[in-house]
Amino acid sequence: SWEWWHDARLYGVDFRSGYNMDSYKYYIDFASKFGIPYIIMDEGWAKSTRDPYTPNPTINLAELIQYGKERNVKIVLWLTWLAVENNFDLFKTFADWGVAGVKIDFMDRSDQWMVNYYERVAKEAAKHKLFVDFHGSFKPAGLERKYPNVLSYEGVLGMEQGGNCRPANSIYLPFMRNAVGPMDFTPGSMLSAQPEDNRSTRANAMGSGTRAYQMALFVVFESGLQMLADNPVYYYRERPCTEFISSVPVTWDETKVLYAKVGEAVVVARRKGDKWFIGGITNNEGRTINLDLSFLPAGQSFTLTSFEDGINADRQAMDYKQRESKVNNATQL
């Protein structure tokens, strides 16, 4: 769960929302209810972006870490790269505090010094059993293979860019950006809009594309750390959608591409254990794609729960239809 995208603007609650104790406990409670293992405390948790040791006066970090621990939810802290560089002993300190990982931001360059910085960070974080999410980063080049505690990188025009993030561009990402490594796209908008209707602001963050499209992104895009970027108030309201996206794994045992045409559409099937997840996205143009489920094990029947664009999704992007059906390896969809 991530508060920055919607500026921690909770509502319908009996406390003043923002970057404060009551709000973060609300995020922890939400994450716990849906089995989400982490919350990210983004820019605003610290008194100064230069000081990684002093929370802002509204935050008792030790209390929040303990509150989360009691509910099986761990905390990830956002930092600027320079604060990390100037306080490189913070990894030990954060580990001692019980922090799970760090989200490091604003590198915004890829010269040799910065490339070396990434590895120094990954190595030091691994030494103290912390994971790393590189935000404001260049695209990955394999560092996560040597340091598997590097879970994701931004390096993409993702949902943080509001209305500028459109399906017509994002359809290329599975073929290009995500092909070279994990991608912190931050999907999950419940306030979905067709691109021409997107009026996203920090107060009312919106995602372009239909509701079903937003849900499919969790399957199509790979990231070792996925965000539920939207307001928990919306997620509570849209429980079937939330239950699905919070159930999608972030690591996979098997992946099959069922359909792919660059710039037009892609459909992938991914397996974790004995469960299969299928996700498909387009460039926002409607199309019919026939899917062959012959990859399923022979002699077994599966219950398919699907989330599909509703009949009016082209006019109101939040329109979707949920249905269940029995399928097997002879089924054609």
What residue ranges belong to the model's regions?
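C-terminal beta-strand-rich structural cap/linker in extracellular carbohydrate-active enzymes
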Residues: 324-333
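Solvent-exposed beta-hairpin/edge-strand motifs
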Residues: 295-311
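Conserved structural scaffold segments of CAZyme catalytic domains across common CAZy folds
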Residues: 1-70
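Carbohydrate-binding surface patches
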Residues: 262-300
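Acidic/polar loop patches that form or flank catalytic/metal-binding clefts of enzymes
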Residues: 130-136, 159, 163, 227-236, ...
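Glycan-recognition and catalytic regions of carbohydrate-active enzymes
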Residues: 230-277, 314-318
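Aromatic- and carboxylate-enriched substrate-binding clefts and catalytic-loop regions
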Residues: 41-210
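Long hydrophobic segments that form regular secondary structure
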Residues: 195-221, 226, 271-276, 281-287
